[in-house]
């Protein structure tokens, strides 16, 4: 599971470090469904959970690629992983503020700076109690 603000390089980190591991990406599902991050996320999350269950049933490793910035936002997904007996690792990515904003401006789906700032205000780093392993990449 990834844990990071928009623009920190989650996709890039996954491509560089886990190139052969399937990914369940909320951004990719939004694009498939034609849903903006500003719209209701119910169908996006439902599709993501369907895909996660497919991987879990097949005992196949995968990456959950979303911001996952608070314990509440991680809880449901991590419970699903535990229900299937999966080994869970949370990768926390952090970059300097200005670098993250620059990267965000170069994304296809730009998130407004005030929204990212609010997300940062709610960010709660994961506890080692939430997963088998927590990796922090700065």
Say what each PLM segment does:
Residues 32, 56, 69-109, 118-127:
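ATP-dependent NMP and nucleoside kinases share a basic, alpha-helical "lid"
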Residues 23-26, 85-87, 112:
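Short hydrophobic/aromatic-enriched beta-strand-loop microsegments
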Residues 2-3, 8-11, 16, 20-22, ...:
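Conserved GTP-binding G-domain of TRAFAC-class P-loop NTPases and closely related GTPase folds
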Residues 44, 83-84, 130-135:
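Short, charged low-complexity intrinsically disordered segments located at boundaries
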Residues 8-62, 69-72, 97-102:
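Conserved substrate/cofactor phosphate-moiety recognition/catalytic segment
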Residues 41-45, 82-83, 109-112:
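Short, low-complexity, polar/charged sequence segments that are solvent-exposed and flexible
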């Amino acid at each position: 599971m990834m844990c990071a603000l928009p623009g920190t390089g989650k996709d890039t980190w996954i491509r560089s470090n886990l190139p052969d591991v399937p990914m369940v990406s909320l951004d990719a599902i939004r694009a498939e469904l034609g849903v903006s991050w500003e719209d209701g996320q119910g169908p996006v999350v439902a599709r993501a959970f369907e895909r996660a269950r497919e991987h879990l049933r097949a005992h196949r490793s995968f990456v959950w690629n979303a911001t996952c910035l608070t314990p509440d936002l991680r809880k449901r997904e991590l419970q699903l992983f535990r229900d299937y007996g999966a080994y869970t690792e949370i990768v926390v990515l952090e970059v300097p503020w200005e670098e993250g904003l620059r990267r965000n401006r170069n994304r296809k789906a730009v998130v407004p700076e005030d929204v990212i700032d609010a997300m940062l205000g709610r960010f709660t780093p994961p506890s080692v109690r939430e997963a088998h392993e927590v990796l922090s990449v700065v």
